[in-house]
Amino acid sequence: MAGGAWNRRTSLIVFGIVLFGCLFAFSIATEEATKLGTVIGIDLGTTYSCVGVYKNGHVEIIANDQGNRITPSWVAFTDGERLIGEAAKNLAAVNPERTVFDVKRLIGRKFDDKEVQRDMKLVPYKIVNKDGKPYIQVKIKDGETKIFSPEEISAMILTKMKETAEAYLGKKIKDAVVTVPAYFNDAQRQATKDAGVIAGLNVARIINEPTAAAIAYGLDKKGGEKNILVFDLGGGTFDVSILTIDNGVFEVLSTNGDTHLGGEDFDQRIMEYFIKLIKKKHGKDISKDNRALGKLRREAERAKRALSSQHQVRVEIESLFDGVDFSEPLTRARFEELNNDLFRKTMGPVKKAMDDAGLEKTQIDEIVLVGGSTRIPKVQQLLKDYFDGKEPNKGVNPDEAVAYGAAVQGGILSGEGGDETKDILLLDVAPLTLGIETVGGVMTKLIPRNTVIPTKKSQVFTTYQDQQTTVTIQVFEGERSLTKDCRLLGKFDLTGIAPAPRGTPQIEVTFEVDANGILNVKAEDKASGKSEKITITNDKGRLSQEEIERMVKEAEEFAEEDKKVKERIDARNSLETYVYNMRNQINDKDKLADKLESDEKEKIETATKEALEWLDDNQSAEKEDYEEKLKEVEAVCNPIITAVYQKSGGAPGGESGASEDDDHDEL
């Protein structure tokens, strides 16, 4: 670099004047409450998602259209439609390249991130590089290939959760609290908010999952100060948090964890065990057979769940490969042996979180289990042993605790929480230290890790060179002392500083983290009042406004397409229901069997048989075709039925029976 350029532009040196470092806690946001409707709480999980709402003084966890209170975070594409949840997951074995799961591992990350590179090898669908970000490439229909951002796939899951809540509440929902792992950095939080926008949701708050779990737990624990350890071992991530609860006031003391440890890793170990076993017994390597792997993955998960309550399970899969049926036992002891190192690995973050909080084991009053994987007896035992025999608390359903807490927070924000939540004060924390680079590549920390947010800190810096007119502010997150070992979030220049001897100018740098953990940085030359600022967004691969708008539009088009598919299915079901209803009536002695002339019966039989054959040959006909066919069959059957009932003085059962049935979706 030329000498002159070096004089004008260099790093900063700490002048050491700390102006202020106030912490602000937040309670009920009344100004927000005035403009928010009902605010639902969504736990957007790596493997499963869950939605709740605060209603009539308590939280309701809402079941989906399959009757399940947790929904797989899976999306699948077939030639005719897009599936979300159970339907998508069930299709994985036969449709692996077009079934997308674990997208939370990609959201807010760069394509060359080592985690993304590692995960690419573990999923059957294709991940491609677009503008340095990982996008998912799938065939949607008629051989058409499309790429989706992780935000778009997450938005599809959020839409499913939103629709689940809307069906239960009987009204449109616009506002939500969405949870993220405590370890999510700013890019991942921003991307999660963007996913909400694409799904048509205003994400009123992003809160940490363990914090949400603590709220779920805290409602009935208002007496005195308690230290609580939240142990959250889900399908994809592991988080440990230590909180204090004092008369309804929550404070997070520390967080730790592992972004890649959870139930799926335990499933993977079971799969690897069986893949080796199959190779040994049958000489067949199924590790590249996506269809077989999909079937095996589903059974591995089922076996793991069963082993939490029984000591042995038989894994049975019909026609796993080459027409060979698979049947093998798996004991709890073998399962524990396969995962022993992973189970033990969970204790490291527990110890680190304890050290960060500055607490002894005896000072933990309650241990709260969150996430389905905490049902595993060995995990519970290791935790109990670590805390010298203290029993973990099981008063909260581990699958639902996070959504429950998010729903309570939603109740607070919407003002629907009432007396039960009015005393809750929620203090969240910054998951990683935030700072800037100063001379020598030093990471100068402005907001230490675990600082309560929202927060604002300012510090005055000065110039390193005489006559320096520009400074570059480089913003980093991380715990290391040199910026080369931390993560660059963004940078900007403050220009137009009046030339002066080194150490003279005063440049005030202000870091502000809002309640969602999103960072704004401002630098101001105190002499001239000139300032520059940055919200850490696009520099970190966040979607642009245009991209978000395009994705919102596409999401609406998908919704329109989904609506058309549903209308087509409804029309088909109406025809099928009418035909079967008619066939039942003409063969039932209590209904029409004895009242019809043989030629009348034959006419109806011919019309219904022909309709069923037409249905078999026209599986994917259009809605109008099904409606037209129904009219044709009705034109034959209804006059006969009406005449019969007029003769006998009854109601024309064929018509009313059929139309009544039309109002109900078939299971």
Curated annotation (Swiss-Prot):
Glycans are attached at residue 618. Residues 658-667 have a biased composition (Acidic residues). Residues 644-667 are annotated as: Disordered. It holds the Pfam family HSP70. It is found in: Endoplasmic reticulum lumen. Its main location: endoplasmic reticulum. Disulfide bonds: none annotated. This is Luminal-binding protein 4. The gene is BIP4.
